């Protein structure tokens, strides 16, 4: 039987939320173990080359990969933080034991508190031949280009005009790839105007109320058929277009990766505003399973800026519940809550606020 690893706070997921949680908890004095399934922490940050918005505290003006490197360095230089990479958590059990697999070994951890920061996965959509080589999720395209330096093709159709679709389209243009167009099923663009304006200035059409009806090609993508949608989201006959492309990139949203929350018997609820099933929690991010916190996209899909603040809040609350930071934790917690309110104050954030209000649970957090 494997030896059990005793730790005060276990953080599952080394993306923006997980790294921020680790730093915050360790800064208050808690001993932290962070588990990341990839060979390097950072999550989505390592492939983001665009500059962040917000305040200086949310790293405004810095690029995603720079923020990721900074958070990784903070974890690596803090003696209170231990990081296991290339390790996958398998389960959270009734007795509090967490099992994981890493480098061919079966591992057991017995944490006092758990923060789940597993992020989200890309959604896909159904259309004929959507399994052809050359059809990618937007995150995969970012990884190919910004991590490995490989362009996915020469002519791209982007599906989805949210922030991810707009940002990845611009990054494709910067890499010398032609973006023949961006289509969006909704009648309005979901992403920020600043991103859409850059795309339009580059001459890329953004077609709202449009969808893909079929991809085609012999051994890989050679083209796509698209059409316009009416107010009932039905195809309008005679509006079909045939676009010659070798890549179709899907940026149609994310789904919270909540499998561990389900398995840990957290009370869950489907909330469309938060992009799927998410755990009930209180404002301090503690779920209905006492001692288990959530942060980042696993608690509802938002921007990375919000994920980092949520991670910081979860780390503070988990550490405080163990008796750390009695002199400063409440002040830090109040500051983090205020930052989240500020980030969610705009029109885009109101959707998130509406979703969160459906979830609020009294919980048992000591913050």
For each feature predicted by the language model, list its residue ranges.
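Residues forming the flavin
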Residues: 1-367
């Amino acid at each position: 039987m494997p030896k059990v690893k005793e730790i005060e706070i276990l953080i599952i997921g080394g993306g923006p939320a997980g790294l921020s949680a680790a730093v915050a908890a360790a800064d208050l004095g808690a001993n932290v173990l962070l588990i990341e399934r990839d060979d390097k922490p950072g999550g989505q940050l390592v492939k983001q080359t665009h500059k962040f918005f917000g305040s200086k505290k949310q790293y405004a003006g810095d690029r995603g990969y720079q923020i990721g490197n900074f958070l990784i360095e903070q974890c690596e230089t803090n003696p209170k933080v231990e990081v296991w990479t290339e390790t996958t958590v398998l389960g959270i059990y009734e007795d509090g034991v967490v099992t994981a697999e890493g480098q061919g070994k079966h591992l057991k951890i017995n944490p006092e508190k758990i923060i789940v920061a597993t992020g989200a996965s890309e959604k896909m959509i159904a259309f004929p031949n959507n399994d052809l080589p050359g059809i990618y999720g937007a995150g995969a395209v970012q990884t190919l280009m910004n991590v490995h330096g490989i362009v996915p093709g020469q002519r791209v159709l982007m599906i989805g005009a949210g922030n991810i679709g707009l940002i990845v389209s611009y990054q494709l243009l910067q890499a010398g790839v032609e973006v023949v167009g961006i289509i969006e099923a909704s009648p309005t663009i979901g992403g920020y105007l600043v991103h859409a304006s850059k795309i339009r200035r580059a001459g890329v059409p953004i077609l709202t109320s449009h969808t893909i009806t079929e991809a085609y090609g012999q051994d890989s993508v050679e083209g796509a058929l698209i059409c316009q949608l009416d107010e009932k989201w039905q195809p309008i006959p005679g509006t079909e277009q045939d676009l010659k492309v070798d890549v179709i990139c899907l940026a149609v949203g994310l789904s919270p990766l909540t499998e561990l929350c389900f398995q840990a018997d957290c009370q869950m609820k489907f909330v469309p505003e938060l992009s799927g099933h998410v755990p009930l929690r209180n404002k301090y991010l503690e779920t209905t399973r006492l001692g288990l916190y959530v942060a980042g996209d696993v608690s509802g899909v938002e921007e990375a800026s919000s994920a980092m603040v949520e991670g910081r809040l979860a780390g503070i609350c988990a550490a405080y519940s163990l008796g750390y930071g009695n002199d400063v934790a409440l002040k830090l917690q109040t500051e983090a809550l205020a930052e989240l309110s500020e980030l969610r104050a705009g029109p885009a954030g109101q959707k998130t606020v509406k979703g969160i209000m459906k979830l609020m649970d009294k919980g048992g957090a000591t913050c």
